[in-house]
Each structure stands twice: as C-alpha cells, then as structure tokens.
C-alpha cells in the first residue's frame, strides 16, 4: 500500500500537466511511496492524451476520466474514492502549489497524530511571495473567517488546495460530498468539523497564477462558497450564529410580508385576503430559507411530516402573537410596544420550534 495518494484534478491543463506530474514524482526522493491519480474532467484540449501517456510511462500514475465535464469538486471526489494510500492529498495541476511541501504536511500528520492537515498560504514561510490580487485574497480570508464562525474551527486558509487526510477518514466523508465545483472546499471543511477529527495547519509556499495564465475561479464561485458554508455548517453551528442567521431569515420573511401586503392592497385585493396571502408568502419564504441555509431538510421527518410540523408551529405562534398583542393592548400598552413585544416573543418561539420540532435532527 502506498504511503501517499495524490489526487490531481485536471481540466484543460495540457501546458502544465507533465511538469506537475514530474514534480509530484520527485516526492519519491524523500522516501515516500507514492500513488498519483489524475482525474481528467472531460478536458477539451490534449490533457487526457497526455495523462494517458503519463500513466503508461510511470507505474505510480493512474488515470480516471469523466465522460462529461462535472467540475473540480466532482473530479476530486472521484479520486478520493479510488485512493489506496495511507494518506490522501490534493494537488492542482496548475503548479501554484509545490508538491515537495507535502512532506511537511506528512510530518505534521505523524508528529501530531492528526487526522487532517491543511496547508495554509497565510501562515507565512520565511521566503518571498508573488503579489497578485488583493480582492481575491480578501475574499479567501473572509470566507475562511465566516467558515470558522459556523464550524468553530480556527483555520487561516479554508480555501487552500492542500488538504491531507487519513484515508479511512476521507473515504468515510467522500461518499456524502455533493459539491461538484469550487464549493468542495467549504463543504469538506464543514464535514471535517462535523466529524470531530483532529485538524492541524502548517505553512506552505504559494505561487499564484493570473487569470491570463489560466486561473479559473471567479467572484461567482465566492458567492456560491458563502452559500455552501451556510448550507453545510449552519445546522450544527454555535447557537449564537444560528440565532443571528435566523434573524436575517426572519427579516427577509418580514419584508416579504410587508411588501406583499402593500402590493396586494395596491392591486385592489380585499384587506383580509391581502393579510392572509402575504402571511402565507412570508411563511413560505421563511421555510425555504430555513432549509436552504440554516437547518437540515428532512433530517427527522418526511417532507410531508416536516411541512405539517411547520404549519402547526406557524398556527401556534400566530395564535400566540394574536393573543399576546390583544392582551397587552387590554393592559394599556401602546399598540407599537404591544406589537413589538409580541414580535420578539414570536421570533424566539419560532426559532425554538424550528430548531427543536420542525427541523430537529436524529442524534
């Protein structure tokens, strides 16, 4: 069994693939038994042919292929499931990362008895670095900060390519991975955090390439990464972060309620019907946002059971809101404060019901 399996996701990398594999194979000089798995993601250039020749030339190299383009995350997942090494890492084919540094990650893995080691671009080694895009770096650091807030890890570089895993750990996690593109990084980080394994970081050098040189990630991937952080981490996030996120969900639903009500009135709808329809729309938005970015959909109930539980809690909290508002008004509280207190109670009650009843999780 090889000591180290390196997954090389490849899409249109004909210019750098040979150099990448040759540099990866140099790891053997450090006494490391090696397996290199190139996963060609249906490249449009000659990458697949080059990879096939490399697999014929070197016994350490294996080639896996996708019949259609699925994305970097899908290519990595394919390789992770096929790896045979004691430790499994990821190596981009674009030469931004130096494969020889995997010896540092392996040393941390062994010395600290770690389960996962991240190679951080922001724990600075003592050498010069190439300076490129401020906003790209800022986006990476911001996404790492938000990821840490929801996973309760203390990483400096969640988006790094260099992640080293014990094979038994990653092959337990890999079948659950869903992200096919650059959402892989926040998803795998969330699931590593949920697994409760020992995570370490060590400094690595990084030689970024420009967009003119073939860099593929863009701002849309950053937005999707933010969604992935919430979608895969929020349901087990620290309670204050869940409450904060639910505040924004509630705010969005409230805006839909108000906007829908005023729009329906302006369209000539009866006041009572406008109130009811706007409330239903707001409840639907609340539910959809809850399952998209905060709680697990169908974690305990079936879809029907979950919707019925949600409807029941909406009715209960609607009655609480009505009764509390009427009661406070009867005690002489002004309408503004009566509704404000009822809204606060409703926010707390709705959150508790969502978390403990509607979207409860099996333990």
Name what the model sees in each region.
Residues 40-49, 95:
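A conserved acidic beta->alpha catalytic loop
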Residues 4-13, 20, 27, 39:
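A conserved hydrophobic helix/loop-capping motif in glycosyltransferases and polysaccharide synthases
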Residues 23-33:
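Short, acidic, metal-binding catalytic loop of nucleotide-sugar glycosyltransferases
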Residues 66-82, 87, 99-182, 209-220, ...:
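Acceptor/aglycone-binding surface of glycosyltransferases and processive sugar-polymer synthases
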């Amino acid at each position: 069994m090889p000591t180290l399996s390196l997954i090389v996701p490849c899409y249109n990398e004909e210019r750098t693939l040979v150099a990448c594999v040759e540099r990866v194979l140099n790891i053997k000089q450090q006494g490391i038994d090696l397996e290199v798995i190139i996963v060609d993601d249906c490249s449009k250039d000659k990458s697949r042919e080059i990879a096939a020749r490399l697999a014929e030339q070197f016994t350490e190299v294996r080639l896996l292929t996708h019949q259609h383009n699925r994305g970097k995350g899908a290519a990595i997942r394919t390789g992770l499931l096929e790896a045979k090494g004691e430790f499994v890492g990821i190596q981009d084919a674009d030469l931004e990362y130096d494969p020889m540094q995997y010896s540092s990650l392996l040393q941390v893995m062994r010395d600290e008895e770690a389960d996962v080691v991240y190679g951080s671009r922001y724990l600075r080694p003592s050498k010069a670095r190439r300076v490129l895009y401020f906003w790209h770096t800022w986006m990476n650091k911001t996404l790492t900060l938000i990821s840490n807030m929801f996973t309760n890890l203390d990483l400096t570089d969640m988006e790094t390519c260099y992640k080293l895993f014990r094979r038994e750990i990653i092959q337990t996690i890999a079948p659950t991975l869903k992200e096919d593109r650059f959402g892989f990084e926040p998803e795998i980080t969330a699931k590593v955090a949920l697994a409760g394994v020992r995570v370490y970081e060590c400094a690595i050098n990084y030689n970024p390439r420009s967009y003119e040189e073939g860099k593929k990630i863009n701002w849309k991937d950053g937005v999707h990464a933010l969604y992935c952080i919430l979608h895969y981490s929020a349901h087990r996030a620290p309670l204050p972060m869940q409450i904060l996120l639910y505040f924004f969900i509630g705010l969005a639903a409230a805006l839909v309620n108000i906007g829908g009500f005023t729009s329906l009135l302006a369209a000539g709808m009866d006041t009572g019907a406008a109130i009811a329809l706007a409330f239903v729309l707001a409840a639907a938005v609340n539910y959809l946002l809850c399952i998209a970015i905060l709680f697990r959909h169908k974690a305990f109930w079936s879809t029907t059971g979950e919707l019925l539980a949600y409807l029941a809690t909406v009715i209960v909290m609607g009655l609480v809101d009505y009764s509390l508002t009427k009661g406070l008004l009867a005690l002489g509280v002004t309408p503004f404060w009566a509704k404000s207190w009822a809204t606060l109670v409703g926010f707390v009650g709705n959150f508790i019901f969502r978390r403990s009843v509607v979207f409860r999780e099996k333990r």
